[in-house]
Amino acid sequence: MLLILFLLIALTSSAYSEDLKKLKLDDASAIGTTIQTDIHVKAEGKASIKITTLWPTTICLGEVSGLDVENAKLLYKAKVKSDLDGTAFLEMWAHVGGGQYFSKGMNDVVSQKTDWKIIQTPFLFQKGQRPDKVTLNLVINGKGTVWVDDIVLSKEPLK
């Protein structure tokens, strides 16, 4: 008897489901974010990465493993240029011993229209802490265009 009641409730509850919105992805522009190589705007080398977005987003720029940064400060730096309504900054995720920890460079940002600027975010690894990998992101809090070039990871001794 309980099984019949359960099945009856399960079947009738799905009848009240209502689709609120469908996102058709027939065209990549519907996503609102484009990433492309820009050979005309660059800080060095042959090109930069140009990111244009209609809303806030986080872009993974890469992952690095095998870093020897125990008992050291890891610095994630990049040259960044913007034409933006909002701010953009670097974010680094350190994967250490099964956990994930982050550093957000919210004190070192680009906003509005800026020329090339080096921004950075640090992560401190104590003795015995070694990252399995590090994820390098760019966070855009707003809409507009951000160019990224010349990403550098460096380490400094802890003071």
Regions flagged by a language model, labelled:
Residues 2-12:
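Bacterial N-terminal signal peptides
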Residues 14-159:
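Extracellular and organelle-lumenal recognition/adhesion modules and their flexible linkers in secreted
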